[in-house]
């Protein structure tokens, strides 16, 4: 995952393949910089490409704790004025995309047990429509009350580079307004649906005063 700070600053953050065993994850971690873990579904084997077994999740968390990683919220990383600060060495943050119900029911209790902060990137259309497989606004409010934080993930979860830029702007503003209305928040970090961006979208995020954006970036 790459996190872009607009106004020129660029921070590269390594994306761990979270479907691997804890031993293989350990080999993939960058001990000299910040690592961001990205999850989607928890204990939903029907969706193997985005699911993680919660027993494997526990192994990931225990490895990081036992090896004394500096586990912080993603906002703590992004708010560092000097992105080369030694603070980033062995620093780790956790994010979850989409607000699937399985995160709230299966994943979040584990993160809470280990006292680990999580940023949840919320696609608002499915929440607003009360989709059965996604969190509700009440559950999102509970998540925030219990220490979680939220970021922007568009309203529609569409593949944005394929959209007209005016339609993207309408989509993003709708999402921002709903999050402010329902959660009382004005997030400044955005995760691109499907991890893909374009120069036009980057310019639009600047226009909307969204300071950071997450791109999908895989490493060998």
Where are these regions (language model features)?
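Short, electropositive alpha-helical surface patch
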Residues: 170-172, 201-213
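Bacterial N-terminal signal peptides that target proteins for export
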Residues: 2-10
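Bacterial N-terminal signal peptides
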Residues: 10-21
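N-terminal pre-catalytic segment of deacetylase/amide-hydrolase enzymes
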Residues: 21-92
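Structural detector of well-ordered beta-strand residues that form the stable sheet scaffold
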Residues: 72, 119-121, 151, 211-214
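Conserved small/polar residues in nucleotide/adenosyl-binding loops
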Residues: 217-220
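Metal-dependent polysaccharide deacetylase catalytic core of the NodB/CE4 family, i.e.
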Residues: 32-47, 87-92, 100-200
